[in-house]
Amino acid sequence: LKAEHLIRTHYRDALRGYRLTKAAKEMLLSVSPLRFQCYLTGNTETNLIRSEVSRRIRLHQKAETYLTLLHAGIPFYPDVKPDIFCNHREAGSIGMRSLPLFYASREIKELGPETTKIRNSRSMGILMAPQCVYVLYNTGNGVLKWEYRTEVRLNAFLQHYLQGYPYNGHPQIRAIMTGTDMEMAFRLFTSTGGYKKSLFMLDTSFEHFHYLPNTPEGEVLLKLLVHPEIMEKLDNLLLSDLGCRSDSIPLEHDATDASGNPILLAYDFDMQRINRFNTGLNVYGRSGNLICFDFQIPVLKKYLTATIHFSSIDLCKFKRGFLHEP
């Protein structure tokens, strides 16, 4: 692309990046104007030269998020989905069969004054799946800035705005945090918000908060999170030879083993559930079992403090058996 003069290197403040040339923008706009005009025309953020490090990093994280969505087969371009964040949206213009779909934060904020109170949200956008709505964040290789009240307002706004459209009643709102690698999950688990409490920490803004890396492993997990029928199939397989949940065990769990110990399905890497499971085991002095993907085990062993036995799901076998990928 550099040899064809479609991109050029931009190096400033010890940060290297790439920018589209004028020829590249013109080519994209001529090939698919409906797809790219919102990114490459006017005063949109992606069409202006940004020199501030924070803005350049934010744009890089957006691109990283789009690449993860692309590899997971999730539509995000404006020309392949209905415009639902507008004042003239039509009921029935989006159906459950068309999900999953991703809407960027900028698309949501086009509603205008209705979104004033969520303009400072750190989200990249929302991922509408058949069973719930995920608010997507990208922490990159550092702990994300966080404003609890803003994210709570975003949660409430989405429940209200998407009620009955296309979900029955208020949709369940969950969150997904992406990051450079699995090691970032440990930093998020252990974050206390920093000196001024302005950084991310696990709080009550979302009852369920998943983590996945911006890697091929994370892309597989993302595919799983937006296909509840595959998750149900995997759950049934994992629980088939285990005991049922026990009301006598006063902590979060999905099943029990032959000795009556609680078992948690943690392959979806819900940081909130994992944290509650670990805390419960410590409080009640119990041991437990945790089932997750093989690539998730090292960071969990590093973080968890309770007596826990790990059972791993082979990611390669899962891809072949459930996603029919090599």
What is each stretch, according to the model?
Residues 137-326:
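C-terminal regulatory/effector modules of DNA-binding transcriptional regulators
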Residues 12, 50-57:
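Conserved aromatic-histidine-acidic binding/catalytic patches
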Residues 4-42:
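Accessory beta->alpha helical hairpin/"wing" motif in late/C-terminal subdomains of nucleic-acid enzymes
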